[in-house]
Every structure is written in structure tokens, then in C-alpha cells.
């Protein structure tokens, strides 16, 4: 019994420390590869553009359709892309603002996920997500 508990604790530790991996969202890695730029910040900017285009495609849909699923995976790729920023960039005030945008995007996406089947709410949250992505991109441009 103790061996099972130890094995379970070890597996939870490994999953918890995997930080920048695609264990639960394997397609997010594909989007991160597609958006790969010369730097971590450029990759994040490419992902924000990709997400804006996908958010526009997801408008008018319902549930977890293809565009919404793509947006979901791109969202996780963007969150993980924060690990690709250099130490010097991470110490800037603009990066702190980018982290704030990340938190705001997370809150918006949670609400978007909640209302994925409620059409008027879904489109409103997609619009809000697009605005926040534009603000994030502007912030990232100051870091570069």
C-alpha cells in the first residue's frame, strides 16, 4: 500500500513539475511549432495572431466545434510559450504586464468555456478575447 502511495505521489510530482509540456494538450505542441519565431516573444506574438484568426472562425458556432477546439489548443500553446522568454525579458515591466494579460486571458477563456453552448455569450466572450489578444500583442512588441 505504501508503495502505491509513493508511486502515486511521484507521478503527481512529475505531472506538476512538467510546466511547459503538452501532456494534456498534445495538439498545443503542433501550434507552438507552427508559430515558432526567432525568440520566445516572437512565438507568443505569432500565437496571438493565430488565436485572433481562430476566434473569428469560432464566432457563430456552438459547443466544442473544430474552431473552438483549435482555439483551446492555441490558448494552451500561448500559456506554455511564456516559458520561452529570456531571463532579461522576464525582468522588464512590460513582461509583468504580459503576465497580467495572461491572467486576464485565462479568466476570459474560462468564461468562454462556460458559455460555449450559449451563442450570444460565446460571441461576446470571443470578442473580448480578441481585444485582450491585441493588447497582449502590443505589450509583447515593447518587450522585443
Q: Residues of each region from the PLM?
A:
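Short, low-complexity, Pro/Ser/Thr/Gly-rich segments in the mature regions of secreted, periplasmic
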Residues: 129-144
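Amphipathic, soluble alpha-helical interaction motifs
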Residues: 53-57, 81, 88, 111, ...
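Immediate post-signal-peptide N-terminus of mature secreted/exported proteins
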Residues: 20-73
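Mature extracytoplasmic/luminal segments of secretory-pathway proteins
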Residues: 17-20, 80
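Bacterial N-terminal signal peptides that target proteins for export
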Residues: 1-8
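Bacterial N-terminal signal peptides
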Residues: 8-16
Amino acid at each position: 500500500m505504501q508503495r502505491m502511495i509513493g508511486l502515486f505521489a511521484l507521478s503527481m510530482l512529475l505531472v506538476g513539475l512538467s510546466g511547459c509540456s503538452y501532456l494534456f494538450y498534445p495538439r498545443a505542441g503542433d501550434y507552438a511549432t507552427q508559430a515558432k519565431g526567432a525568440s520566445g516573444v516572437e512565438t507568443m506574438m505569432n500565437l496571438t495572431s493565430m488565436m485572433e484568426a481562430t476566434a473569428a472562425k469560432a464566432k457563430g458556432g456552438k459547443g466544442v466545434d473544430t474552431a473552438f477546439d483549435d482555439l483551446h489548443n492555441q490558448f494552451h500553446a500561448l500559456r506554455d510559450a511564456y516559458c520561452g522568454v529570456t531571463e532579461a525579458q522576464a525582468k522588464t515591466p512590460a513582461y509583468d504586464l504580459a503576465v497580467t494579460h495572461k491572467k486576464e486571458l485565462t479568466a476570459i477563456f474560462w468564461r468562454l468555456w462556460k458559455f460555449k453552448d450559449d451563442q450570444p455569450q460565446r460571441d461576446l466572450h470571443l470578442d473580448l478575447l480578441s481585444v485582450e489578444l491585441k493588447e497582449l500583442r502590443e505589450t509583447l512588441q515593447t518587450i522585443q
